[in-house]
Curated annotation (Swiss-Prot):
Coiled-coil regions listed in the entry: none
CDD domains: Ribosomal_L22
Keywords for this protein: Ribonucleoprotein, Ribosomal protein, RNA-binding, rRNA-binding
Gene: rpl22
The protein's assembly and partners: Part of the 50S ribosomal subunit.
Cellular component aspect of the GO annotation: cytosolic large ribosomal subunit
InterPro entries to which the protein is assigned, alphabetical: Ribosomal_uL22, Ribosomal_uL22_euk/arc, Ribosomal_uL22_sf
Organism: Methanococcoides burtonii (strain DSM 6242 / NBRC 107633 / OCM 468 / ACE-M)
Family: Belongs to the universal ribosomal protein uL22 family.
Protein known as: Large ribosomal subunit protein uL22
Lineage: Archaea, Methanobacteriati, Methanobacteriota, Stenosarchaea group, Methanomicrobia
A Pfam family annotated for this UniProt entry: Ribosomal_L22
UniProt superkingdom: Archaea
Length: 151
């Protein structure tokens, strides 16, 4: 596996980083959730992600929204990406732990940067009738998050 770098760099003294590589989650849903939580305070983002996991709050889908129904609130189309939200919640907790290790207070921080990049494709084959086989590939995602102190 190649070394993955962060797509942006912020002030190292006032920020903390976390990265998840080759996660088995949807790239499209990851993009929409990254867009939804960027700029939130860490407490609000943690509560939002927990609400998504228990299907209480929907994530607005701006790009990948064909044949999606409307949801409650100010959004038009939305979904409940539970698997992506649980992985993003782990990433947020990791970033908060890194902030505590650096001597920062995670209660006074916000999500300054989130990004997703497609990871490698895990190739697989599914046996079919009459000796044939069909490809069954698994997409992976690399997530990154940087939290920074509120100025």
């Amino acid at each position: 596996m190649a070394r993955i770098k962060y797509t942006t760099e912020l002030d190292a003294e006032t920020s903390a980083k976390a990265m998840g590589s080759e996660l088995h989650i949807s790239p499209k849903k990851s993009r929409e959730l990254c867009k939804a939580i960027k700029g939130m305070r860490t407490n609000a983002a943690r509560q939002y992600l927990e609400d998504v996991v228990i299907l209480k709050q929907a994530v607005p889908f701006g790009r990948h929204n064909d044949s999606l129904g409307h949801r409650k609130g100010p959004m038009a189309a939305g979904r409940y990406p539970v698997k992506v939200a649980s992985e993003m919640l782990k990433l947020l907790k990791n970033a908060e732990s890194n902030a505590e290790y650096k001597g920062l207070n995670p209660e006074h921080m916000f999500i300054a940067h989130t990004a997703m990049n497609r990871g490698r494709v895990i190739h697989g084959m599914r046996p079919r009738a009459r000796g044939r086989a069909s490809p069954e590939n698994t997409e992976t995602v690399n997530l990154e998050m940087i939290i920074s102190e509120v100025r």
